[in-house]
Amino acid sequence: MLRDLKPTDNVGGFDVRPGNFLLNGATTVSGGVNFTIHSVYAVECTLLLFRPYAKIPYARLRFPDSYKIGNTYSMLVFGLDEIDFEYAYSFDGPYEPEKGIIFDKKKYILDPYAKAVIGQSGWGKKQEHEGVYKARVVNSDYDWGNCTQPKLPFEELIIYELHVRGFTQDGSSGVKNKGTFAGIREKIPYLKELGINAIEMMPIFEFDEMGSYRNYDGRQLYDYWGYNTVCFFAPNTSYESDHEHHHEGRELKQLVRELHENGIEVILDVVFNHTAEGNEMGPYFSFKGIDNNIYYMLTPDGKYYNFSGCGNVLNCNQPIVQQFILDCLRYWVTEYRIDGFRFDLASILGRNEDGTPMDKPPLLKSLAFDPILGGVKLIAEAWDAGGLYQVGSFPSWNRWAEWNGKYRDDLRRFLKGDSHLAWDAAQRITGSRDLYDPTYRGYNASVNFITCHDGFTLYDMYSYNEKHNLENGWNNTDGANDNNSWNCGAEGDTNDYNINNLRIKMIKNAFATLMCSQGPALFLAGDEFCNTQFGNNNAYCQDNIISWLDWTRKEKHKDVFEFFKYMIAFRKRFHIITDSRGKATCSYPPVSIHSNVAWSAKYYDDTRMIGVMYAGVSLKQQGLDEFVYFGVNAYWDYVNVELPDLPEGYHWKLYINTGNEPQDVILEDRNVILYDRRINMAGRSVIVAVGERF
């Protein structure tokens, strides 16, 4: 028993004994703290202890040779008060840069398994000891009560992507704890009103927003998005309003608990493709000083591969790195009750040590079958910066879903009126069956989205033809050039009544399409009230009104907000949209694709009208069938549309018609009944009809 352990040695003035070699990181145990860390090529490891915020360690405890088994160092240090110390490591070993081995015993090394990193609590403030990261032991005790995870079916997910700081940092958010986990918690009633059932938080692992700090034209620029991870086991302390030492992470747990209590799942955007250490010119604070040639993909002469576009690439399928990633995800699932993960540039996770794509990557397979991660949602951004594009072909083992980039691209182009896209758009709406075999993966593998953090907001997509990224400081060369956007007749904000009305209609068309598509849905926070980034499609460095949500727009664009609420509720109400795999009792196909002529899917080059019908057994009215028709006319003029015939006694009732502004949402007591199954659809509009029995 741990409580019976006694010291066996004295090192550096501390009573110690060999530690628990299976207990990674620094962990409070009875009588002291257990420290464990691994290095293959080091010849010496020293534990450094600091007083809070001190620059120089007050104690150096070199691990005795007997405290090393294999490549693992472990020591239990007695008498430490976890509140009164911080720690780091020093490693000594060979310096052979041509082999990628670059030990420097003068460097303070951050524990990769650290649960909290000090000196990061004040957003936008440079560290007192720049480039030096120290860790703190965390009290992980938290009472989850009777709270259980929602465990929603994948196909029912309506994911709301947000940035923790940007979501509430603007004064218009009305919250007390702006830009923090607590600020999101204050907005839970809003999320409930909107109707989403999952949030996807952009990176929350510890990162240093000052890591790429610079000044451009008097504007301070930061690593705002947080995709350069400093520590993978520690939540970003600058996202916490309560900075009580030894309890880091408690505020995030409270947020997760309250979201779960309200039926909302939590998905984390995680970055295992690279780290904040960069390339040969980058900082040196963790993996570089432990086993640089193991943790990173290196060229034969010891340089860094750069498939991430960020300076280095984690060697994800190396067994040690693979185990590290698995340990990390298990920790977030067990300690924070996280429901799912979206993996940034996930195709890198399928490359071997020299960057060659693998058929069956060990890491991806181990994550798919790990028992702790069973039921956890795994979502891949199925491409990388090295040219590997795997949408529709990402190794899945029927467990991995994908951000469907083809859905985004095809629907953006189709909705703005491009030709030769009707068939592709119809495939995307009906679950991308050409990409995801319904008999194997199915549409659950397709996370559909039209907007996300990377690119234009939905409002900007219909307000700008070109990106406007000058504020980023790269002379407008950064960010994608091919946005498939359309400004509707004027670049940026305008007082033109017709253009503004058209923009609102296009926004509604896009969101209605997303809500009537098969597969999990994702949209960007703020799209529901026309949030703008003023044409910036790469706001990674903008900690200001460019990236912060402007909540005053919720009232200004109240009709858009109400439309989003209605469409989310509609999708939830009619389950056949999200789960139409069963057969309807009247032998209608679960999904059928139409043109402006019912039961005809002959699309020509100039076809810009799609009709989709979902049919299935009603879950609410026993013995009845359910029919939903979604039609989109991307043409700029009227098109006469014939809806499919229905069983005897059923008729089509119109619920949505964006060509009928401002009454585009038709109240149920005023629904238009299409007795002749025909409607003259306005240009650039969508309709949604429900087959009901009278």
Q: How would you describe each model-predicted region?
A:
Residues 114-117, 337, 353-354, 359-525, ...:
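Conserved alpha/beta catalytic core and glycan-binding cleft of carbohydrate-active enzymes
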Residues 163-182, 186-338, 345-369, 435:
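Substrate-binding/active-site clefts of carbohydrate-active enzymes
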